Structures are given as C-alpha cells and as structure tokens.
C-alpha cells in the first residue's frame, strides 16, 4: 500500500489542469513506463500499450488526468487577478482559501470577494485572487490564461484514507496504472491500452479523440463518485472502503457489468453499485460513441468532498479496483 500511496501523492502534486496537463502527464508516464510502451499523443493524453500488442481485440483502461482549476482573465487596476472556472469549481470553498497561481513561477494567493453574509455566496466573477502585489508587479509574473489551482498537499489520514486536491481523477489514474503493473509481462489474449485522458473536466475531447484513433472493442473507465458523508445518505451513495462502484447506466454494457460483478465475487473483491438514469458525466460518454461504438463499463472510486481542496479516498478501494480490472482482462479470450 505504501507504493500505491507514493504514486497517488506524486500524481496529485503534479500540476495538470484541463488543456495544460503536461506535468501530470510526465509524472503518470514515469509510473507507467515499467509496465507498458508509453507515448503522449497530440491531445496530451498518456497512452500505454501492453499485453498482446497488435492483436485485433483491444481493451481500453481509462482515467482522466486533468484537475479542476480556474483561469486568470485579467489583472485589474489594483493588482487583483480576476478569474473564471476551468471545470466544475466548487465556489462554496473559495472565499478566504489559499490558491496557487501557475504563472511564470508558482505564486500563492488568497481568494477574496464581495461579502454577502453567511447565507449567500458571491458569483465567481465577483471573486479575485489577492497576491499582495500591485498591477505592475503582478504583470511581471502573471498573464491572462494562467491557471489557478487549490493549494494543499496530499496527506495520510487514519487507516488507508488519504486527502488531497486533484484526487479527481489522479486516484483513478493510479488505479489504472496499478492494474497495468499487475498485468505487465503476462501472456494476454488482448492488447491492453491505458488511456490517461486530457480535458475531461471541460468536455472530454481527449478521451473522445483517443478512442477514435485507438479503436478499442471494450473500455473500462475509472473516475470518482460521491461517497457517504453528512448530507448524503447511505443507500444512494457509496461507502469509503467498500470497494469500487460498478456502474449501471444506459451508456454502459450490461454484459460487461455482469462479468465484472461475477469476477469480483470469484476474487473476493467487494463492490458497490452506482445507478445512473442518464449520462455518466465522465469520459465514458465520449468513449462509448467512438466510431461504431465501444462496449463500456465504469468503475467509480468513492470520494468525499469532490471538487474541493480536501478530497478524500480510501487507498484500499484503488487497490481493489486495480485488481478487478486485471482479473477481468485476464479472462478475455
């Protein structure tokens, strides 16, 4: 579990916002290259090949690289950085929060904004990042388009739980890489393609274009989903440490789901179900419609505090997810 934690922490500490994933891609490629032939495609996706490379049947193991962030839109006359969302930022946690501006160098700032009272939040366009600089000083280090991310470092909690910004979806990337490591060197019937995709938080073009080029027959997509916490009741949401959430949705293959749950029972891997009546809101929605269609399954990692600076996952869920994917791939003929 220590090696898995080290990988998760290293991935979370690498910047990788939508459309600017290069540092995170380099970190992920470094962990993957011992198990697969790795390249980074024109969209910034990390692609790793293993198993029976060149086989007519290919399975994609997917998670997304990018983290939610904000983008500098202008530097106002008083030196404040005006910002816009780059993905689904949770503005409830922003006022008074420290953030990191990825300018010509990494800068620490504080989000400030209009004060409406405890029962109302200012819209994001009324918030700004305070660097403690004048306009002239800020312009030497920051430009419109620079990204702003939550400050914070990964930390171990009790047991096998960890907290960090960007666990959505670096935790999923770690689970997919771990699955590749488990499969490395094995005599497999299918080609296995790891796809750590770009720009999921801003529409999913990374996964969509890669799935078209790679042309898999099947795909297993790993992302995070909501875990039980105050305000989210048991039964509708998953439990941390309860195993991966196997997805049920119109876009997903019922046959693959049945095989995954059967294999989980055989392997003694706990799992939970996640029922979605419409789209999944993940890269699965883009992969499943590539070319003539791709049979897709979805495994979600239970997570608390999604899209905040203190997301929480259980490393045991990541390990079980990796082992379930590896067992599924071994069974393909």
Summary of predicted features, one role per range:
Residues 1-333:
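N-terminal hydrophobic/helix-forming segments and targeting peptides
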């Amino acid at each position: 579990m220590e090696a898995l934690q080290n990988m998760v922490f290293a991935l979370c500490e690498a910047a990788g916002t939508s459309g600017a994933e290069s540092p995170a891609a380099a970190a992920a490629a470094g962990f993957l290259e011992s198990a697969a032939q790795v390249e980074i495609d024109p969209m910034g996706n990390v692609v790793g090949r293993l198993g029976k490379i060149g086989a007519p049947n290919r399975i994609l193991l997917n998670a997304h690289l990018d983290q939610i962030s904000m983008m500098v839109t202008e530097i106002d006359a008083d030196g404040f950085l005006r910002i816009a969302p780059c993905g689904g930022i949770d503005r409830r946690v922003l006022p008074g929060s420290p953030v990191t501006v990825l300018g010509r160098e990494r800068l620490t700032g504080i989000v400030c904004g209009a004060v409406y009272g405890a029962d109302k939040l200012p819209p994001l366009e009324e918030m700004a990042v305070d660097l403690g600089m004048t306009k002239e000083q800020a312009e030497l280090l920051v430009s419109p388009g620079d990204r702003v991310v939550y400050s914070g470092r990964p930390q171990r909690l009790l047991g096998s739980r960890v907290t960090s910004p960007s666990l959505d979806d670096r935790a999923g990337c770690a689970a997919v890489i771990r699955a590749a490591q488990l499969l490395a060197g094995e005599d497999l019937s299918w080609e296995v393609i790891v796809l750590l995709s770009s720009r999921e938080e801003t529409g999913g073009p990374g996964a969509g274009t890669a799935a078209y080029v790679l042309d898999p027959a099947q795909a297993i997509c790993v992302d995070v989903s909501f875990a039980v916490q105050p305000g989210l009741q048991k039964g509708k949401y998953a439990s941390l440490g309860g195993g991966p959430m196997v997805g049920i949705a119109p876009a997903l293959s019922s046959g693959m789901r049945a095989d995954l749950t059967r294999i989980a029972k055989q392997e003694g891997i706990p799992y939970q179900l996640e029922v979605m009546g419409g789209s999944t809101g993940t890269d699965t929605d883009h992969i499943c419609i590539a070319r003539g269609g791709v049979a897709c399954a979805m495994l979600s990692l239970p997570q608390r505090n999604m899209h905040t600076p203190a997301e929480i996952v259980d490393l045991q869920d990541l390990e079980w997810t990796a082992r379930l994917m590896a067992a599924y791939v071994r069974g393909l003929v």
